[in-house]
């Protein structure tokens, strides 16, 4: 059995991950971790996820459950994830990282850790989104410089980073296919007298409202026609199942920083 730990286990995504782990053949939740000051520490992780008792108590200390798992799934916050990364690197534990909002310097720390442990890091673990990334690469190469490109994303009111990591990853894929540097061509929102649009730019628009799980659309607009590639998530379970699939795939893999495209064989 693949022994899996979930950090942030008392949160919305954490509970969904617990359910996904318990549903996956060959996988089992053997540790669940949350903030040390959480009033839920000691509670049964299965009961927190409305699955019934599974005999795995919620821990407030990752080090105390280090011997209980093979791979850690982390969908939390960059500051938390980086602390967990340092621990897993020292302990020789594999990691699945779905946290977004990392700076360029912080992403480099993931690269460095990948020299010692196997890691799957992805902005989005949905199979559909990763298929969209493949389609975006093809669309950008075919349509080339003859289109204006805009990326729109929508998420629930609680999401703290913008644009989403998925939107930025979509922008990176498109920019790379066109031989552009996203940092130089990205335009984040527009206001006032902006002047005529520069076709080399890639625009981003962000919506935060209600309980939207995650919508992403990339628009390729030419004179006379438009192509839109859209993905809409209706449940966090799609991300959780992808993360568990990645955790199973990582079993026996050599140290390295992998992404979901590797897991799905899309490279």
UniProtKB/Swiss-Prot annotation:
Keyword NAD appears in the UniProt entry: yes
Residues that coordinate or bind NAD(+): 8-13, 34, 98-100, 122-125
Pathway in which the depicted protein is active: Amino-acid biosynthesis; L-lysine biosynthesis via DAP pathway; (S)-tetrahydrodipicolinate from L-aspartate: step 4/4
Reaction catalyzed: (S)-2,3,4,5-tetrahydrodipicolinate + NAD(+) + H2O = (2S,4S)-4-hydroxy-2,3,4,5-tetrahydrodipicolinate + NADH + H(+); (S)-2,3,4,5-tetrahydrodipicolinate + NADP(+) + H2O = (2S,4S)-4-hydroxy-2,3,4,5-tetrahydrodipicolinate + NADPH + H(+)
Residues noted as binding NADP(+) in the record, renumbered to the chain: 35
GO biological process: diaminopimelate biosynthetic process; lysine biosynthetic process via diaminopimelate
GO molecular function: 4-hydroxy-tetrahydrodipicolinate reductase; NAD binding; NADP binding; oxidoreductase activity, acting on CH or CH2 groups, NAD or NADP as acceptor
Transmembrane segments: none
PROSITE patterns: DAPB (PS01298)
Residues annotated for (S)-2,3,4,5-tetrahydrodipicolinate binding in this entry: 156, 165-166
Enzyme Commission number(s) of this protein: 1.17.1.8
Active site: 155, 159
Record keyword rRNA-binding present: no
Localization annotation: Cytoplasm
EC category: oxidoreductase
Keywords per UniProt: Amino-acid biosynthesis, Cytoplasm, Diaminopimelate biosynthesis, Lysine biosynthesis, NAD, NADP, Oxidoreductase
CC per GO annotation: cytosol
InterPro entries: DapB_C, DapB_N, DapB_N_CS, DHDPR_bac, NAD(P)-bd_dom_sf
UniProt-listed NCBIfam families: dapB (TIGR00036)
Role, per record: Catalyzes the conversion of 4-hydroxy-tetrahydrodipicolinate (HTPA) to tetrahydrodipicolinate.
Family: Belongs to the DapB family.
PANTHER family: 4-HYDROXY-TETRAHYDRODIPICOLINATE REDUCTASE 1, CHLOROPLASTIC-RELATED, DIHYDRODIPICOLINATE REDUCTASE
Name of this protein: 4-hydroxy-tetrahydrodipicolinate reductase
Originating organism: Pseudomonas amygdali pv. tabaci (Pseudomonas syringae pv. tabaci)
């Amino acid at each position: 059995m693949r022994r899996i730990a979930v950090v942030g286990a008392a949160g919305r995504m954490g509970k969904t991950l617990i359910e996904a782990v318990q549903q996956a053949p060959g996988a089992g939740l053997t540790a669940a971790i949350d903030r040390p000051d959480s009033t839920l520490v000691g509670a049964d992780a299965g009961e927190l996820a409305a699955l019934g008792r599974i005999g795995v108590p919620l821990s407030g200390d990752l080090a105390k459950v280090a011997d209980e798992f093979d791979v850690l799934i982390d969908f939390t916050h960059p500051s938390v994830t980086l602390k967990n990364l340092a621990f897993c690197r020292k302990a020789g534990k594999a990691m699945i990282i779905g946290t977004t909002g990392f700076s360029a310097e912080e992403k480099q720390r993931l690269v460095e850790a990948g020299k010692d442990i196997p890691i799957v890091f992805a902005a989005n673990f949905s199979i559909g989104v990763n298929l969209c990334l493949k389609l975006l690469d093809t669309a950008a190469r075919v349509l080339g410089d003859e289109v204006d490109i805009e990326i729109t994303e929508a998420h629930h009111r609680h999401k703290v980073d913008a644009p989403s990591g998925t939107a930025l990853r979509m922008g990176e894929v498109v920019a790379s296919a066109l031989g552009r540097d996203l940092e130089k061509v990205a335009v984040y929102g527009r206001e006032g007298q902006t002047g005529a649009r520069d076709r080399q730019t890639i625009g981003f628009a962000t919506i935060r409202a209600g309980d939207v799980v995650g919508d992403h659309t990339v628009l390729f607009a030419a004179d006379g026609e438009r192509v839109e590639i859209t993905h809409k998530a209706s449940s966090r379970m799609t991300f959780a199942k992808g993360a568990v699939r990645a955790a199973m795939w990582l079993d026996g893999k050599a140290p390295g920083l992998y992404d979901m495209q590797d897991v799905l064989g899309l490279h």
